[in-house]
Amino acid sequence: MNSGKGGPPRRAMIMETPVAHSVPPHVPPHMVGDFNLFTSPGMMPTPNGDPQAACAVVHDGPPIFYSPSNTRDGRGTWVITRAQDQRRVLQDPESFSSHRSIFASALGESWPMIPLELDPPEHGKFRSLLNPLLSPKRVMALETAVRERSAFLIDRIAAAGTSCDVMKDFAFPFAVNIFLRFLGLSDDRLEEFVGWANDLLHGDNVQRPAAARTIIAFVDDLAAERRAQPVDDFMSFLIRARIDDRPLTDAEIRGTGVLLFVAGLDTVAAAIGFDLNYLARHPDDQALLRREPSRIVLAAEELLRAYPTVQMIRVATKDVDFDGVPIRKGDYVSCATMIANRDPAEFSDPQRIDLTREDNRHTAFAYGPHRCLGSHLARREIVVGLEEWLKRIPPFRIREDTAPVTYGGHVFGIENLILDWS
C-alpha cells in the first residue's frame, strides 16, 4: 500500500451529537420531524455508507418540516425538501438572510465570511470584485498547473504499488495544493493546512475554536506580509482592492481570506472521494468513462448531483407565511443540496446515478446570488482529477479488507477510501 509520503494524515472523524434546542412555540407539533443531517440514519460515520442517498427519505414526507437539531451547535431549522422551494428561498435575500457568522461563532464573535455571509447590496460589491479572479478565463489559465499536479500525485501513487488511500494520497493533497497555488504559497505546510480544516469542520468544541484562531492568525499574518511586500497573488489583490473608492478594512480582508481558506480545502477533496468511491463500486460506469473519456465532463455533473456536500442555511429577516407554514423572524431555514438533488419532482429516478444524464439542474454549487464563487475552479479540479486518474490507474475497486467511512453533518465527506488495482 502507498505510504502516502507527502500526503496529510487523515484523523478519525469526530461527530458530536448536537444538543437540541426546544421547539419554538409557533411551530405546529404536526410539523416537527425527526430527521437531521447529523444523527439520522446514515449521517454518523458509517462504513460503506451513502449519506446523500439516506437523505432521500425526506421526500416521503411534507415539502417543509421543522427539525429541532439540524446545525452543528444544535439549532433547529425548517427543512425545505423540494428543489423548487429551495430556489425560492435562495433567491430571496430580502426575506432570507445569509448572515450567520458560521466561522466567527466558533469564537463567540459575529463577523461575516465575505461574500458568502453578506446580503445585498454589500454582497454584490464584493462579488463583482472577486468574480474575475475565479472566472472561466482565469480558471483555464490554471488548467496546466491543475493537470500537472494531478498527474504528479497519481504517478507517485502508481509507482508506489497497487493500492492507496485516495483521500490521504490524492484527494486532499491535490485540492490543497491548488488552493495554496491560488494563494501564491508553496505546499510546504500542506499537512498543517489539512489539519486545521479538519479540526474546524469536523472537530469537537475544543478543536474548532483552536483551529479558528489558528486560521485567523495565518490570514492576518499573510495580509501583513503582503502589505509590506506585495506579489502577484490573491492576498496582494485584496490589499490593493477598493470598494466604494476605499481600501478594504482589516476585517473585510480577514473575512474574505477566511472564506477562501474554508471553502478551498474540504469540499473538492470530498467530491473526488465520493466520485472515485462510486466508480470503484460500478465497474461498468468506470469502463464507460475509460472507453469514452469525453463523457467525463457530463459524468462529473451527475456525480455532483448525486454527491453534494453542503447545506445552505438562511435566517428569516421577517415573519413569512411559506405556503401556510409560519416561519418567524430569526428562524433558520435549511436548503440542503443533498435533499434538493434527490427530489423526484426535479429529477427522473433521482436515486439512480446515470452518467449520461443531460440537462442536469443540480444545486451542488447552491443557487441564486450566492452561487458558489469557486464553482468553475472546483469543476475543473474534479474533471481533471477524474481524467488523470482513469488515464493512469488501471481498473480499480475497493480493497476487500477495507470499508470507506462516510459521514453527514456540516459538510458531508468520506474519511478513507482504500482502492486496489492489483
Show where each model-derived region lies.
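Cytochrome P450
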Residues: 5-422
